[in-house]
């Protein structure tokens, strides 16, 4: 995970406290982050189910509506959460599949929070009604990452279900309305790379605080669409757009945390770019990367 906002623009972002902040630090929001790497325990991403209401063509988990038979039981899931709390894990991200397909998700999130674990969910957003958003807030989930892969039909074609984009947008609005932090997760492919400008416009219009751009992972159903992966020139152009837009957000005072995921070379590219633009900053970035 490469934090573009932090590295390229020296921007203070909420990403670190979302991952490493400690609830027992005296700050009720857990926004104090240990400075020593040795004090930062690993964040756990837990695919809590393989059930999903969508049919995303690039799903790394090959999830589907009929794939919940082997899901862990509530009792065993709570035992896992006990172990994570004992280990000192700062945050658990419930993913899937679609975590909101689990009837006990809110029970598990509440249990985790009472055990001292910050809870986050990764969702497609289409199931977040006003009532679900309120329950997300009430059970203590601190952040909701919603997956989108383009605007309108571009997203729906990825997701395999018409209307998925509009439902996800409503889910975003429902979360913001009740005061839950929201970010977006996007997988870059040849189908949506030309839509990057529109996506950044969408971030601004929806007041999105965090956006993660994922490189295509060739596993699950994603292994069947490797031809959709970006070419070298497309990837470079995409990173240049992301860097330019992140700089624009910084210069206009917009607090949006921009990251890329799944290709550590992005960090090297950013460093080499800074080496030409701002050698002093490049030196600091080198230390952060290494």
Predicted feature locations:
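Radical SAM/AdoMet-radical enzyme domain recognition
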Residues: 74-95, 102-231
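Conserved alpha-helical substructure of the radical SAM core
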Residues: 2-143
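Short, histidine-centered active-site or binding-site loop motifs used for metal coordination
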Residues: 62-65, 150-152, 217, 264
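A C-terminal junction/extension of Radical SAM enzymes
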Residues: 221-290
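A general structural signal marking secondary-structure boundaries and capping sites
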Residues: 63, 162, 179, 246-249
